[in-house]
Amino acid sequence: MKNQFFNLKTISLALSALVLTVSCSEDNTNPTEEEKQEESRWITVAAAKMGDNPGDGNGGTLIYALSSDDAKDETKSIAPFDNGFIVPSNRTARLQASEDGNTIFNISYAGDTGGNYSKYTVNGGQNFTATGSEVSIAPYVGSAPRWIKLFDGDKTGAAVYVSTEHQFNDNGTPDDDTDDVYTRTEATMGIVTLDLENSLIKNFEESSVTLTAEEEAQGYYISRIDMPTLNAAGDKLYIGARLSKVDPATAERDNDYEILGAKTIVLDYPSLLNPTVISSSIGYGNTNGYRSINSFLYNGSVYQANQGDSNGSHILKIDSSNAYDNSYDFSLDTALGVTGAYVLAWRPAANGKAVLAYRHDGSQDGISGRPESYFALIDLEAKTATKLEGIPYEVDMEMFQYQSYAVNGSDIYLTAAPVGKNGNIYVVDTETGDVTKGAELVNVDGSHFIGAW
């Protein structure tokens, strides 16, 4: 029965594509029908298998595709752990999708194949066809790269890393380290851009990334970077950053320190040169995110989530001047009426309304050892946020490793399932806030779903 469903759906989408091709060469006599057909697309669901512990996702990644119509149909059921396509990756794969959903991009994470880039044509079900050639970015950014697909028409990917080295003044006695004095920590950023269409390395640069002299003297340094985002002009990249600190007196890690304003690295694109660091006075903590894209371009500005803020996560705004707009104050604690909101993954539709996964201080730890998560609908212009009540929550449902939402017009598709338990795809109409329960997601012990593409 499932195979029949898959074959018919594949044939249906293929015929739809043929009809669209023919309609482009003839007079448009039925625009309503054409627009309706263009709304259909593949939705790919990713499932992360347990390794040693529930929810660790270290047992590998499987993907399964269904049409957007079937994803919205709660009578459908898919079992990616049993019938999915195994994505090459030693641990949880880092996935991206083309804007139309027809291509999946993967860079293997860790292990012997870590850093290998590959892409697949989506054909439905477990049928993903490798296309193009593979290329490794490991020589540039290591075998466990943090990478993202830029929103430039599916042309470019970008991966980053940062390495650090504490620096000391030896007081003129290079052979005696007892009188050495800590001065600062050197942070070296590497970034590689990847031609996604032709599987080629486009550019690679390494640069020193500095904070203010005062911040560095106090022991602060950039320790992790992630999630490059292209600005509206296409001439700057914004890279999220996390700060760490050492005690200048001992050069030992300092875990009890003042959290500084959120920071972002800005560098020229496509040259990848001239990095500078900008700071927010609205949000504090980190901007590098974790597994999902943490900042998005909307209406000429880039909107970015922060994490680790003692006042809860904010949505921050970087305007066309490539600086934080500190007049834009969007506190999720205030909007949601919670304390300690922490953004796990979010994604806006083109209308500036977004679905956001979060936890807060009231979340209880589940079987994975991580706190329960929730979903909210937020509005970037109105600066409002409302918890989505059409989704069943329970303590074992957490989104710490969540990677992606699928956007289809004003609809946003998400996966929601507790660790080790069945769940469903849910579709959020961002215009109305309505939530539609979609296809069932069949789970297995200790495993979880990490998003839709």
Residue ranges and their predicted role:
Residues 1-46:
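Bacterial Sec-dependent N-terminal signal peptides
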Residues 59-70, 117-124, 178-200, 251-272, ...:
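Beta-propeller blade signature
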Residues 84-98, 137-153, 215-229, 284-297, ...:
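Repeated scaffold domains used in trafficking and secretory/extracellular systems
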Residues 205-366:
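Acidic, serine/threonine- and glycine-rich low-complexity intrinsically disordered segments
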Residues 55-182:
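Post-signal peptide N-terminal segment of secreted/secretory-pathway proteins
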Residues 72-85, 126-140, 193-218, 274-283, ...:
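Beta-propeller fold detector
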Residues 39-54, 100-111, 155-175, 235-247, ...:
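Short beta-strand elements that form the blades of beta-propeller/WD-repeat-like
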Residues 314, 322-421:
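Intrinsically disordered, low-complexity segments enriched in Gly and acidic/Ser/Thr residues
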